[in-house]
Amino acid sequence: MEKKRVVVTGLGALTPLGNTVDTYWDNLLAGKSGADYISKFDASLFKTQFACEVKGFDPLDIMDRKEVRKLDLFSVYAMATTKEAFEDSKINLETVNLDRAGVVWGSGIGGMKTFQDECFNYKDGDGSPRFNPFFVPKMIVDIAAGHISIKYGLKGPNYVTVSACASSTNAIIDALMLIQLGKCDFIVTGGSEAGVNIAGIGGFN
């Protein structure tokens, strides 16, 4: 069986070096560092007090406040980069067979901050099991791919690879193979993580 040719039609980036592909690439070539002192929480008592954070990003630039409340930050990052990639690709989804278009995303830990915040809220409460109804839907790793598919109407394969720091690489490889083998015509792929929080930094310390 002859493998199909695969091309990259659009790119998106939201990184500690820049919030668009062009900014990220320019800063990368300039040798700039994305590391700085942690600003997302008070890390003064932590062994590690620096991290590579995404800077100057406002989720409300890409979705409304009601949507933002339903998503963990790692899913918001996924939606932001996908939006840029679609705009870069200039693909007209009306010309795509959406049954053969899917999402293969990568994330090592998913909604860690959601899990952390819900545990803190329970600990600080009166012991009553009052949890946000979006707790699990925000936290689970595969929800990022789900939100992308829902927004763009993609009805093909939809899943997230979880393999620690190789998660996004594995997602891209899977997406490549799905197209090469003729299973899909079009795949959104990549990865997102939002681990700069108390649980993330404390755990990796």
PLM features per residue range, with description:
Residues 11, 106-108:
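Structured loops at beta-to-helix junctions and adjacent beta-edge loops in soluble globular domains
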Residues 40-91, 141-155:
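A glycine- and small-residue-enriched flexible loop/hinge segment at structural boundaries
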Residues 13, 71, 161:
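Generic anion/oxyanion-binding catalytic loop in active/binding sites
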Residues 2-3, 16-19, 30-38, 87-99, ...:
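Acyl-thioester C-C bond-transforming condensing/cleaving domain
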Residues 1-67:
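ACP-dependent fatty acid/polyketide chain-elongation machinery
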Residues 23, 74-81, 167, 171:
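Generic hydrophobic secondary-structure packing signal
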